[in-house]
């Protein structure tokens, strides 16, 4: 029997690429042939081949923040991307096409629909991007990480790394801990300057006996500044540029302080850990605030806007949190998780491939 073929369309950021990889690996383990369509300048061009997934490329980018010339050339660039997408689809001959987001999904998704290829669309954020809003009108199935992000969609959750769902239940972790709280600060690959500045100062404002044990990840570009900030504040912190084992880091934490990207929010829920979200204030459509609100409005996380984040305020918040309160938040977060997201997205792809 000939192996079925999946074409994954995703690019630009890890929020699109990593969930796509999770589904790609799941279907490949079932014997599928997987090909990835992306942009040569996106992170997918470096990351995806490391997983032994062949690539097809098209040229297409966004308009936000671009000059007048780029906007004037949009029709020509779109026609080129349409043509390149048709070529890729004819070479790959996919049984099903999975769009996970990024600018390149728009021309490729439109051409997949035009050529009669089954199209599955997955929106990672709580507020859908423009490309997915348009593609949702022609897709065979529309899936969302957050409820009602797109009309007529199924809430599947975000595909996250499998080891996060395997972390023991919050009760078995929090109930057996004593001593100072363990706080994990995650700034991402680029770091988060606001967190790097405020957290050490907040820790310094607490009496020594009330200070948490802090692990603070800041990215390679920010790590020297972060270490200088801790030294200037006169407090201890395990400062690292990267964390290789995020599952272990989440499992060890009582509280995570982080941004509110779609994958971060989904990982926090899957891990079952309490979080204090500080949304990136310049995110498109302020979607990080909406992502964080999904958990915070149900008592599963705390939400502080960056313009309200101060050392004094954070110190007061930390001083007022008990491990029991954090356990309750962690339980609520785990209750909102969708641990079978990867499996569900893969199942839907299989269903549509069987009909093609």
From Swiss-Prot:
Protein's name in the database: UDP-N-acetylglucosamine--N-acetylmuramyl-(pentapeptide) pyrophosphoryl-undecaprenol N-acetylglucosamine transferase
Localization per Swiss-Prot or TrEMBL: Cell inner membrane
UniProt-listed SUPFAM superfamilies: UDP-Glycosyltransferase/glycogen phosphorylase (SSF53756)
Stated role: Cell wall formation. Catalyzes the transfer of a GlcNAc subunit on undecaprenyl-pyrophosphoryl-MurNAc-pentapeptide (lipid intermediate I) to form undecaprenyl-pyrophosphoryl-MurNAc-(pentapeptide)GlcNAc (lipid intermediate II).
Organism phylogeny: Bacteria, Pseudomonadati, Pseudomonadota, Betaproteobacteria, Burkholderiales
Protein source organism: Cupriavidus metallidurans (strain ATCC 43123 / DSM 2839 / NBRC 102507 / CH34) (Ralstonia metallidurans)
GO annotation, cellular component aspect: plasma membrane
PANTHER family for this protein: GLYCOSYLTRANSFERASE, UDP-N-ACETYLGLUCOSAMINE--N-ACETYLMURAMYL-(PENTAPEPTIDE) PYROPHOSPHORYL-UNDECAPRENOL N-ACETYLGLUCOSAMINE TRANSFERASE 1
Enzyme Commission designation: 2.4.1.227
Single GO MF annotation: undecaprenyldiphospho-muramoylpentapeptide beta-N-acetylglucosaminyltransferase activity
Highest taxon of the lineage: Bacteria
Keywords in alphabetical order: Cell cycle, Cell division, Cell inner membrane, Cell membrane, Cell shape, Cell wall biogenesis/degradation, Glycosyltransferase, Membrane, Peptidoglycan synthesis, Transferase
